[in-house]
């Protein structure tokens, strides 16, 4: 071509959650059934949709307006309903105009980072969720700036590290919070959120909160919506229905803009997001019309409570199966539907192995491991040996080796097998390293 077509930003795009699928498919071609524990799709794992939620969408499809375009920011009735839900809580007040719909939270992420000045940086947590870290890196063609989540403190934010990074990098304009956290399953106490808000206030930053899992906090765990604690700091909260209905195929998400009037530059930035959305005309219309009816139904609170209890029980199952394995650290999830296993220092030494019956598949796996990070090698060998697909933790923009798995399997016996097999494979892998050493 007469000109280079490839953006330098493309080098910063990675998504380990899907990247591992390509290798999993290669393993499957060698005759091994694959159990996919890499992606957070409850529907794909067999969770049934509540009949009353299905009926609401059936009714929506019968409305002519669900087949056409909607206003760029979203249907007014959906905006009004969501703004009312925010205003039912103590804290920041918003208007319907502060709700802007996108085609899923991922679309919101792309716009929020894509229309920032390339000189304005957003610091995010590490481990990071790949959609955020890649989008932030790509918008400026630079490595993502992160603050540590402490594995020795329940994966909570290291606030001293956050303060240090803010002071070190004057280009930082905003702080990203993911609560409940993906990939760790941690949920941030109110006082932690308040301290992050205080840092934003002190340094003149805005906040981004990914709250896609905020209605999936387990019983007995206390947290808050950002709108409840960010009373005087401009912020963008990202929400959606992919996880909590669940309806990931709807691609229906939105942002809540908090305290827009406090800063003229922030307000102009929000205007640019709307202008960018206007170029696409609008977001998917049908699911928007379902949101007010689902969220306003008296059965919805029961639905959310049931699912939170269900995932809390599964987290307990996983913790019991894995916590006794030597050489790893496991934090029991407090929200969302993921858990993370962390390898302790020295546990991975290049000598670890898992048996793979097929010589051909073993060769494929070992070729894949050449030059790969140690936790990626474990994931490849786990796939070849046991047929379970998980995501390497270093794929989440962190130096900590480990892996993430889901709590989504609906078949009780199979879920028990998954957790038991993970524990057995880990024990075997780490023991072979000790013997070889």
Positions of predicted regions on the chain:
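PLP-dependent class I/II
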Residues: 1-73, 77, 83-437
């Amino acid at each position: 071509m007469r000109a280079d077509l490839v953006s330098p930003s493309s080098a910063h795009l990675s998504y380990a959650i899907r990247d591992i699928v390509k290798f999993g498919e290669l393993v499957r071609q060698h005759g091994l059934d694959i159990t996919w524990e890499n992606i957070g799709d409850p529907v794909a794992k067999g969770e049934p949709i509540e009949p009353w939620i299905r009926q609401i969408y059936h009714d929506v499809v019968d409305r002519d307006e669900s087949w056409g375009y909607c206003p760029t920011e979203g249907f007014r009735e959906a905006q009004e309903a969501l703004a009312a839900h925010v205003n039912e809580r103590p804290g920041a007040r918003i208007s319907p105009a502060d709700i802007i719909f996108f085609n899923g939270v991922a679309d919101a992420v792309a716009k929020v980072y894509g229309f920032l000045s390339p000189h304005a940086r957003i610091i995010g947590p590490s481990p990071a969720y790949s959609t955020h870290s890649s989008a932030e890196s790509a918008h400026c063609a630079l490595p993502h700036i992160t603050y540590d989540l402490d594995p020795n403190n329940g994966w909570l934010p290291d606030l001293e590290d956050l303060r240090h990074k803010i002071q070190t990098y004057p280009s930082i304009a905003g702080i990203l919070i993911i609560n409940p956290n993906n990939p760790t399953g941690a949920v941030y106490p109110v006082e932690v959120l308040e301290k992050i808000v205080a840092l934003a206030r002190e340094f003149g930053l805005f906040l981004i909160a990914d709250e896609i899992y905020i209605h999936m906090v387990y019983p007995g765990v206390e947290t808050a919506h950002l709108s409840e604690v960010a009373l005087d700091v401009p912020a963008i909260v990202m929400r959606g229905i992919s996880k909590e209905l669940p309806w990931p195929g709807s691609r229906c998400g939105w942002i809540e803009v908090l305290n827009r009037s406090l800063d003229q530059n922030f307000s102009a930035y929000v205007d640019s997001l709307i202008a960018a959305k206007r170029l696409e005309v609008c977001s998917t219309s049908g699911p928007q019309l379902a949101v007010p009816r689902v969220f306003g139904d008296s059965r919805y609170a029961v639905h959310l409570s049931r699912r939170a209890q269900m995932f809390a029980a599964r987290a307990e199952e996983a913790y019991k199966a894995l916590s006794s394995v030597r050489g790893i650290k496991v934090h029991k999830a407090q929200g969302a539907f993921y858990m993370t296993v962390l390898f302790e220092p020295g546990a991975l030494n290049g000598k670890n192995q898992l048996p793979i019956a097929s010589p051909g598949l073993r060769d494929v796996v070992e070729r894949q491991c050449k030059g790969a990070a140690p936790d990626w090698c474990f994931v490849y060998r786990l796939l070849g040996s046991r047929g379970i697909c998980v995501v390497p933790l270093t794929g989440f923009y962190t130096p900590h080796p480990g892996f993430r798995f889901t709590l989504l399997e609906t078949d009780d016996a199979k879920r028990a097998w998954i957790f038991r097999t993970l524990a057995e494979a880990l024990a075997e892998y780490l023991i072979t390293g000790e013997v070889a050493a």
